[in-house]
Regions:
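Short glycine/acidic-enriched loop and turn motifs that connect beta-strands
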Residues: 11-14, 59-64, 113-116, 170-172, ...
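Short loop/turn segments immediately following beta-strands, especially the blade-tip
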Residues: 21-28, 73-80, 120-129, 177-183, ...
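A short beta-strand motif characteristic of beta-propeller blades
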Residues: 31-37, 83-88, 132, 139-145, ...
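Blade-loop segments of beta-propeller domains
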Residues: 32-104
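Beta-rich, blade/repeat-based domains predominating
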Residues: 39-50, 91-103, 138-160, 192-207, ...
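Asp-box/WD-like beta-propeller blade repeats and closely related beta-sheet repeat scaffolds
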Residues: 81-153
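Loop-centered beta-sheet repeat module
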Residues: 162-218
Length: 350
C-alpha cells in the first residue's frame, strides 16, 4: 500500500515550500519526494475533509517588512506545484501552528512571535475572513526564550469540541469555548511550573487525560482533563532525555498510538524519540529512547496501521523510517537516508 504524507518545511537553505512523500508499506521504504507548492517557511500544514490544504506562510514587501498568515491549495489536484485558491496575510509574522475545525468551517492559527491565537471563517468558495484574535496574557517564564512575551505554539480542538491553546512564553494552557461564528470564549487556564515551556498537547478522551510536551524543560506532563468543565490539572511530569544529558535539547512533537498504549516524543538536541507506555489510567513509563539518525527532529508521525513511524530531521535534511512493534510499542530503524529539505512537520494526506 502507498500512503502519502504532506511535509511542512523551513525555506532558509534549500527547501522551496511544501512537499509530499510516499510510504510504501509493502516494501517498507520511503519514496517519491514531490514538490507540492511554493511558500515561505510553511512549517505546519493542515488539510480539511474537502482536501483543501492550508499551509503557514509569510510575505515580504518591497521594504522587507513581513506579514504572516496562510495559503490555501486544492489538495484534490496532482498538478504540482499547486496554485493558491486563496491566502491571507494579516498577522505580524508567520504563525507557528495551523488546524482546521470541519464542523464550523474554521481555521485556527497560533502565532508564536506575535503572541496571538486567531480564528478564520472559510466560505464555500474557499474565501477567508477573520473571526477572532486573542492576545495571550500571563507572567513570563524565567528562561531566555520566554523573556520577550507570550508565545502561543499550538492550537486545536479538544475531544469535546472546545479549543486548546498552548503558550510557551507564559507556561500556560488555555481552554476556550468556541462559538459558531468563530469567537473564542475563555473557560480555564492551567499554569505550569516556571520554565516548563509548553509546546504541544495531545488529548486521550477515553482515559480523560492530556499529555503536554515541555519544549524548554524536555518533559512530558500527564494532565487530568474534566471535559464537562473544560479544566486541566497536573498529575505528574516525566523527562524525555537521559539524566546525564547536559547539552541543549528541546522537546518537540508528540504522537500517541491509536490504542492509547504508547506515547512518543521527539527530542531536538538529543536527537531521539522517547517512547513511553501508558497504562489504563494514562500513567507513563519510559520504555525506549532511539536515535532519529539525523539532527533536530521536529516532527514524526505513525502510519495508518501503526506499523511504521516516519521522523523528519530538520538540520540534516533527512527522514528516518522505523518499524513499530504494536505489542511492545518499540521502534526499529530500517531507513535513514531519505532526503527531505529542512523538514519540520509531517501530516497524513487525506
Amino acid at each position: 500500500m502507498i500512503e502519502k504524507y504532506l511535509l511542512g518545511t523551513y525555506t532558509r537553505r534549500i527547501s522551496k515550500g511544501v512537499y509530499q512523500l510516499e510510504l510504501d508499506t509493502e516494501n517498507q521504504k520511503l519514496q517519491n519526494l514531490t514538490f507540492v507548492g511554493s511558500a515561505i517557511d510553511p512549517t505546519y500544514v493542515a488539510e480539511s475533509n474537502q482536501k483543501r490544504i492550508y499551509a503557514i506562510t509569510k510575505v515580504k514587501d518591497d521594504k522587507g517588512d513581513v506579514t504572516g498568515g496562510f495559503v490555501e491549495w486544492d489538495g484534490t489536484s496532482d498538478d504540482f506545484p499547486l496554485k493558491p485558491i486563496a491566502s491571507v496575510h494579516d498577522q505580524e509574522t508567520s504563525p507557528a501552528y495551523i488546524a482546521v475545525d470541519e464542523d464550523k468551517r474554521l481555521v485556527f492559527t497560533a502565532n508564536y512571535h506575535a503572541g496571538t491565537v486567531n480564528t478564520y471563517r472559510i466560505a464555500d468558495d474557499g474565501s477567508i475572513s477573520k473571526a477572532d484574535r486573542i492576545m495571550d496574557k500571563g507572567t513570563l517564564g524565567f528562561r531566555k526564550e520566554q523573556q520577550d512575551g507570550p508565545h502561543p505554539h499550538y492550537i486545536n480542538l479538544t475531544p469535546e469540541g472546545r479549543v486548546v491553546a498552548v503558550d510557551l512564553g507564559v507556561d500556560k494552557v488555555f481552554i476556550y469555548d468556541l462559538e459558531a461564528n468563530g469567537k473564542l470564549v475563555p473557560v480555564s487556564e492551567l499554569q505550569m511550573q516556571d520554565g516548563y515551556g509548553p509546546r504541544h498537547i495531545y488529548f486521550d478522551a477515553k482515559k480523560k487525560v492530556a499529555y503536554l510536551v515541555g519544549e524548554l524543560s524536555s518533559n512530558v506532563a500527564v494532565l487530568d482533563y474534566d471535559a464537562d468543565k473544560g479544566v486541566l490539572s497536573l498529575r505528574d511530569i516525566h523527562s524525555t532525555i537521559p539524566d546525564d544529558w547536559t547539552e541543549h535539547n528541546g522537546a518537540a512533537a508528540i504522537r500517541v498510538s491509536k490504542d492509547g498504549r504508547f506515547v512518543y516524543v521527539s527530542n531536538r538536541g538529543n536527537n531521539s524519540i522517547a517512547v513511553f507506555s501508558s497504562d489504563e489510567s494514562g500513567n507513563l513509563s519510559l520504555i525506549q529512547r532511539i536515535s532519529t539518525e539525523g539532527d533536530f527532529p521536529r516532527d514524526f508521525n505513525l502510519s495508518d496501521d501503526q506499523s511504521f513511524v516516519i521522523a523528519l530531521n530538520q538540520n540534516s535534511d533527512n527522514a528516518t523510517l522505523y518499524t513499530r512493534d504494536p505489542e511492545s510499542g518499540k521502534l526499529t530503524m530500517i531507513q535513514k537516508d531519505f532526503t527531505v529539505p529542512e523538514g519540520v512537520s509531517i501530516l497524513r494526506k487525506k
